[in-house]
Amino acid sequence: MAKTVEQIAKDLNLSVTTVRLVLGGKAEQYRISVKTQSRINEHVERFGYTLNHSARSLKLNKTETLGLIVPNISNVFFATLAEKLELRCRRSGYQLMISCTYNDVDYENKLVKALMARNVDGLFIVPSTLENQQHHLRQIQKPLVLLDRDFGFTDNALVESHNEAGGDELARNMLAESKTPLWFLVGDTALPSITDRLNGYLQALKAAGIHHREWVIEGPDNTPEGGYALMDSLIDSQGVPQAFIASSLPVLEGAIEALRTRTGTVPPHINIGTFDEHPMLGFLPNSVWSMQQDEDTWAEKAFELMQRAIDGEAVNETAKVDMKLVKRFRQ
């Protein structure tokens, strides 16, 4: 098993400094005897040599680790983003520690404290609330890149999708199919990304001469359970819809389950829109429009901002990543 400088010094009854100078090629400069050099080199040849990363980290105040805090990885977008970001960090020599908050605001703060105690070099965080975001900005003295949610009141580094433009493009394309009302099932407008998607949808309606929000059904939860409740309520009040948009894949999952429960199937005539992309959408019998987030660009942008902050630059940039419309038409 390879040995550290400290272990080599102990084995040979030499000082750590002497061993380090020999291994660093400075033996002649500091007049270390040929005999001592030979002892050290023979020992290394026999056992090998490895860096003591703990000691190196203390000396440099750098651990080459980064932290990522997301709501959960059952959400396809966050799972994919975590994977892409981990791979991007690895390419540059960093390990990424991934933690989930499950939207527990107190636990999120505990995770931040725990990762800071491990002396990570920087943190990527999807904040649960404005209060959490403000807490992190006050408490974290390391490079910080916020992800997905812009609660405002900060000029910190941030990466998010262009959700308003995505909502507008999605609604315009679905309205062009002339199936109305085009309902919007909205889970948790306290999340800035969801509010932006709703605003984009309303913008598309106005462009089509529709100046009301009567087709919007809101609920408090961005979850499958929340989506089920929204669709259940819509069917109770209006019947099975001709067309609808779900504000996220979790909301869509619940909405589809409600349709299956109430009608015994997913009626193929319904036009369905959603945010985020998943191959399983192709198995629906419906025409489906989805706004795909670009996780590869997200990972590149987030790491770029983090690296600049680690290098000492004051980074206050917001990177907005374009979304891509994916269409699946059924005859």
Question: Where do the protein language model's features map onto the residues?
Answer:
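Periplasmic-binding protein-like
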Residues: 120-127, 183-186, 217, 238-248, ...
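N-terminal helix-turn-helix DNA-binding module of bacterial transcription factors
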Residues: 1-62
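Alpha-helical recognition/docking segments in bacterial nutrient-uptake
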Residues: 61-172, 176, 234-240
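Short beta-strand segments enriched in small/hydrophobic residues
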Residues: 16-21, 58-72, 181-188
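Flexible loop/turn connectors
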Residues: 232-331
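Short acidic capping loops at alpha-helix termini that bridge into adjacent secondary structure
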Residues: 180-181, 212-215, 265-271
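Hinge/beta->alpha junction and helix N-cap segments in small-molecule ligand-binding domains
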Residues: 71-79, 99-106, 149, 159-169, ...
